[in-house]
């Protein structure tokens, strides 16, 4: 039972003022509900000597309030003076935050608190309204943070930009009792920051491969049925989608899948397509998303009649081999894009976009949503190793233990929640990504997501049911299969899009050249100024001028996001990685003139290296476009559109 606290009318007024300024609605409501507390307020002679005693075990929030405050302040004003974001576990008496926020370099202090009675008392004692108003002081109750919070927080400014210098500070020894909570929170933040970095693209070469393969695949995309055609003919014709992945648990579900195949729409991963063919289970859709050559091999089969009526849905950046294999066996495929700046620059919106996540099962999940399914059932979605160590079913094309030794094993919660199971970091990333979306689907849409894998890792937010239950309860009537055939555009329309694509790619080659011609001049100017620094008396003025030139150049690169979307896809990952690493230099706190000089030199050197990379990447894009525009040129010649091509080139 808590102690009844008596606050004066002035203190109650102060509490309300603080509550008013608090933007966290959940926390606001929780604080208003509190009537009593297990804490006793202990005030010393000094105004800053405010402590709390936990009457449940007679421990104190601080052992020595003033000493601990001064130690913290000295450390933070020395080591962390320039940090834009600081993280604390525990609100304490809050005085530290008021002191630190007098430093304008600290844009936000993020405080995580498990026991909000502490905040409740302190809100009666000190005025935090100014710090709370513009979210410079952010208070979060750890028990109320969900998947959506972590993914949004860790990908937003300025938290994401400074994620490489993130660390969590304990307010005082008192909080060590919550070590489980602290470790869990720290792990979630670190994982979500890592996830955000990956989703921003962490490899420019990856982006370049995407652009190359997209341009190479353009003629096939334009001359086959579009995503728009798919939606117009197939939306809403079935209530239940079964998504077939290639985890070790798939094998045991195949007999049931075969029995109920006529009553659900079956979406299968590229890797489970040969397995279903072997067992005579015809999927309605086969999805492919990855850009590698080995993935393309899942289509290197001649299954004859089996392929009739199957619709292949292919991400536009897959390896060209995948499409070559398909053209030999069927014309029933649709090439569709995800949102990416180079792809959107071409404005081939008719061929559609949808977000596809990181895994092929995730892509199938989105596709089934866009086709208005009310129930989505996952099978074979283990995202973990089987008990015997296998990563895939026995029938898997690349062997059942294909990924068994590739990555370090990590433990995660198993399906059913009773035990732990082995997985690896890539599967964990797929799992987290899927969990974020499943949570949103169940929250905002009238769609239920079931995990009927009956094995593997637990996917938070899905409804875990036996596959038999799902078949018996959700699948009652036969669907009219095969579904209506999809048609490509008329030849005239195709020609129009082929020419439009050719024009845009050709323009992009020109953009690369123009950008680099300009860029090299700026780079040379900065480099020459830098070289003459070493022997100049006017170093400080000179350094400021160089840094101003660098800032101008960075502004020009940032403007590409609005002016030349075709260049930003390859520069995006480069920029992200550069800014994340630069944060470490940004926060160095120079004590002497020499320190300041060295920091500036380091800053300029980093930017010169970055500029060399920018130049190199744009050059690589130019070369890639020149090489991969060839299939488009062939197609235009084949259709006797040479003179129009000439016009574009002129």
What are these regions (language model features)?
Residues 82-86, 239-243, 287-289, 343-354, ...:
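Short, basic, glycine/proline-bearing loop/turn elements
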Residues 113, 272-273, 280-290, 368-395:
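Glycine-rich phosphate/pyrophosphate-binding loops
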Residues 320-379, 383:
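Active-site/ligand-binding-proximal alpha/beta "capping" segment
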Residues 390-437:
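Phosphate-binding loop/pocket of nucleotide- and phosphate-handling active sites
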């Amino acid at each position: 039972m808590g102690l009844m606290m008596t606050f004066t009318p002035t203190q109650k007024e102060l509490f309300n003022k603080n509550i008013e300024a608090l933007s966290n609605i959940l926390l606001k409501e929780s604080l208003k509900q509190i009537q009593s507390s297990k804490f006793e307020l202990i005030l010393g002679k000094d105004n800053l000597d405010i402590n709390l005693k936990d009457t449940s075990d007679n421990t104190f929030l601080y052992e020595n309030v003033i000493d601990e405050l001064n130690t913290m302040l000295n450390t933070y004003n020395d080591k962390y003076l320039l940090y834009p974001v600081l993280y604390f576990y525990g609100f304490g008496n809050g005085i530290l935050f008021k002191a630190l926020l007098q430093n304008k370099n600290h844009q936000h202090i993020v405080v995580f608190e498990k026991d909000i009675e502490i905040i409740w008392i302190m809100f009666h004692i000190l005025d935090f309204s100014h710090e709370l108003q513009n979210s410079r002081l952010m208070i979060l109750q750890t028990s109320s943070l969900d998947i959506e919070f972590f993914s949004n927080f860790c990908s937003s400014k300025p938290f994401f930009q400074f994620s490489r210098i993130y660390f969590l500070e304990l307010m005082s020894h008192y909080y060590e009792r919550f070590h489980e909570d602290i470790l869990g929170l720290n792990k979630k933040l670190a994982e979500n920051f890592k996830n955000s970095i990956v989703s921003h693209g962490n490899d420019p070469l990856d982006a370049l491969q995407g652009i190359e393969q997209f341009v190479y695949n353009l003629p096939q995309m334009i001359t086959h049925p579009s995503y728009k055609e798919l939606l117009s003919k197939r939306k809403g014709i079935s209530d239940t989608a079964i998504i077939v992945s290639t985890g070790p648990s798939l094998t045991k579900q195949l007999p049931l899948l075969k029995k109920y195949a006529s009553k659900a729409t079956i979406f299968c991963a590229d890797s489970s397509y040969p397995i279903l063919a072997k067992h005579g289970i015809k999927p309605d859709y086969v999805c492919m998303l990855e850009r590698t050559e080995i993935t393309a091999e899942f289509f290197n089969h001649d299954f004859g009649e089996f392929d009739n009526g199957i619709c292949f849905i292919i991400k536009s950046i897959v390896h060209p081999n995948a499409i070559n294999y398909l053209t030999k066996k069927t014309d029933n495929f649709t090439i569709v894009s995800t949102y990416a700046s180079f792809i959107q620059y071409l404005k081939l919106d008719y061929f559609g976009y949808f977000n596809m996540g990181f895994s092929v099962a995730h892509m199938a999940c989105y596709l089934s949503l866009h086709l208005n399914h009310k129930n989505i059932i996952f099978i074979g979605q283990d995202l973990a190793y089987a008990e015997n160590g296998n990563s895939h079913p026995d029938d898997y094309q690349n062997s059942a233990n294909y990924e068994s030794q590739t990555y370090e094993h990590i433990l995660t919660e198993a399906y059913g929640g009773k035990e732990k199971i082995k997985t690896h970091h890539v599967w964990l990333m797929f799992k987290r990504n899927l969990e974020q979306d499943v949570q949103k689907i169940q929250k905002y849409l009238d769609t239920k997501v079931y995990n009927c894998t009956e094995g593997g890792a637990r996917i938070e937010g899905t409804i875990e049911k036996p596959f038999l239950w799902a078949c018996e309860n959700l699948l009652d009537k036969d669907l009219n299969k095969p579904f209506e055939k999809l048609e490509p555009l008329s030849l005239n329309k195709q020609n129009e899009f082929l020419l439009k694509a050719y024009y845009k790619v050709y323009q992009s080659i020109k953009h690369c050249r123009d950008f680099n011609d300009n860029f090299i001049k700026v780079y040379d100017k900065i480099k020459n100024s830098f070289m003459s620094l070493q022997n100049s008396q006017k170093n400080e003025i000179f350094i400021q001028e160089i840094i101003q030139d660098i800032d101008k150049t960075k502004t020009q690169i940032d403007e590409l996001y609005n002016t030349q979307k075709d260049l930003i896809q390859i520069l995006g990952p480069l920029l992200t990685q550069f800014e994340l690493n630069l944060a470490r230099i940004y926060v160095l706190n120079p004590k002497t003139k020499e320190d300041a000089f060295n920091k500036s030199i380091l800053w300029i050197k980093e930017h010169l290296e970055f500029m060399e990379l920018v130049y190199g990447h744009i050059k690589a894009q130019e070369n890639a476009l020149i090489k991969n525009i060839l299939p488009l040129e062939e197609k235009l010649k084949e259709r006797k559109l040479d003179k129009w091509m000439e016009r574009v080139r002129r």
